[in-house]
From Swiss-Prot:
Disulfide linkage: 7-37, 19-50, 36-41
Record-given protein name: Insulin
Main subcellular location: secreted
SMART domains to which the protein is assigned, alphabetical: IlGF
SUPFAM superfamilies found in the cross-reference section: Insulin-like
Gene3D superfamilies: Insulin-like
Lineage, uppermost ranks: Eukaryota, Metazoa, Chordata, Craniata, Vertebrata
Record-level GO cellular component terms: extracellular space
Entry's Gene Ontology molecular function annotations: hormone activity
Family stated for the protein in its record: Belongs to the insulin family.
Amino acid sequence: AANQHLCGSHLVEALYLVCGERGFFYSPKTGIVEQCCENPCSLYQLENYCN
């Protein structure tokens, strides 16, 4: 998958898809918004936010 800009609900949906039952921590403090909304990020980067 190509890198994508993911913001707001799109970012949360992508995390649900990537993390599944593991769940994830969504906090602006983790830098995920800078990494995936302001800049394009990969699914591999999203996996860093799974529990």
